[in-house]
Amino acid sequence: MTYLTTWTADARPRLLEETTDPARIAAVLAAIAVRFERWPLAPGLPAGAEAEDILAAYRSRIDALSAAEGFVLVDVAALHPSAAADWREVAAAARARFLAEHTHDDDEIRFFAAGSGVFYLHVDERVQAVRCEAGDLISVPKGTTHWFDMGVEPDFAAVRFFRAEDGWVGAFTGSDIATRIPDFDALARRSSSAAQPQAEAPAAAS
């Protein structure tokens, strides 16, 4: 499930809020001009589906969004666990690419067709860490300081929308804030714990 945590953006970040409620997540993100919505998952797509199959499965929604927002290029970024000898090296390099805080000269729009990844949005002395899951669409406005973590074992497929071929190039801020906020894997463990049902307290003795 989609999971949002809010942290202070100081030397010792503190957790201010956590939620899995889609309406609350959308409201928190809307307050910082970040678009968040859910698309129905396309039936029949197998695990590890090819890019062309993902694009075909969501073609009507992709075309509608592209026409409305002026996107000229759409592709699929995907990485899944593999038995290849160099997979961990490839995964680590892919993860490191946007793991530090940066901005873009264009909006960053991603639709997760499979798997998950965490966008960290640093706005107004807060960091909103939103773990996007399959079916989530997120649009980060240009100029927003943020970073993205796919975890130590990436497993996701995301449709990317661009208004220009070079719009995804990152301008890094030099801040080390990304090292102070829990990463993808720490948040995954935290959300799993939060989702566990709590045992009922024993009845008080009469």
Curated annotation (Swiss-Prot):
Which residues of the sequence carry a binding annotation for Fe(2+)? 102, 104, 108, 146
Q: Does the keyword Amino-acid biosynthesis apply?
A: yes
Q: One GO molecular-function annotation for this sequence? A: iron ion binding
* Cited Gene3D superfamilies: Jelly Rolls (2.60.120.10)
EC number per UniProt:
1.13.11.54, 1.13.11.53
Cofactor(s) essential for the protein: Fe(2+); Ni(2+)
Cross-referenced InterPro entries, in alphabetical order? ARD, ARD_bac, RmlC-like_jellyroll, RmlC_Cupin_sf
What keyword terms does UniProt attach to this protein? Amino-acid biosynthesis, Dioxygenase, Iron, Metal-binding, Methionine biosynthesis, Nickel, Oxidoreductase
Which residues are noted in the entry as Ni(2+)-binding?
A: 102, 104, 108, 146
What's its catalytic activity? 1,2-dihydroxy-5-(methylsulfanyl)pent-1-en-3-one + O2 = 3-(methylsulfanyl)propanoate + CO + formate + 2 H(+); 1,2-dihydroxy-5-(methylsulfanyl)pent-1-en-3-one + O2 = 4-methylsulfanyl-2-oxobutanoate + formate + 2 H(+)
* EC category name: oxidoreductase
Return the Pfam families for the record: ARD
A GO term (biological process) for this protein? Answer: L-methionine salvage from methylthioadenosine
Which residues are marked as site: May play a role in metal incorporation in vivo? 101
Q: Where is this site: Important to generate the dianion?
A: 110
Q: Which CDD domains does this entry report, sorted A to Z?
A: cupin_ARD
Hey, which pathway is this one from?
Amino-acid biosynthesis; L-methionine biosynthesis via salvage pathway; L-methionine from S-methyl-5-thio-alpha-D-ribose 1-phosphate: step 5/6
Q: Where is this site: May play a role in transmitting local conformational changes?
A: 107
- Which note does the record give on the cofactor? Binds 1 Fe(2+) cation per monomer.
Question: Could you say which protein family the record assigns here?
Answer: Belongs to the acireductone dioxygenase (ARD) family.
This chain's function reads: Catalyzes 2 different reactions between oxygen and the acireductone 1,2-dihydroxy-3-keto-5-methylthiopentene (DHK-MTPene) depending upon the metal bound in the active site. Fe-containing acireductone dioxygenase (Fe-ARD) produces formate and 2-keto-4-methylthiobutyrate (KMTB), the alpha-ketoacid precursor of methionine in the methionine recycle pathway. Ni-containing acireductone dioxygenase (Ni-ARD) produces methylthiopropionate, carbon monoxide and formate, and does not lie on the methionine recycle pathway.
Q: How does it assemble?
A: Monomer.
User: Under which name does UniProt file this protein?
Assistant: Acireductone dioxygenase
Tell me which species this is from.
Frankia alni (strain DSM 45986 / CECT 9034 / ACN14a)
Lineage from the top down? Answer: Bacteria, Bacillati, Actinomycetota, Actinomycetes, Frankiales
User: In the UniProt record, what gene is named as encoding this protein?
Assistant: mtnD
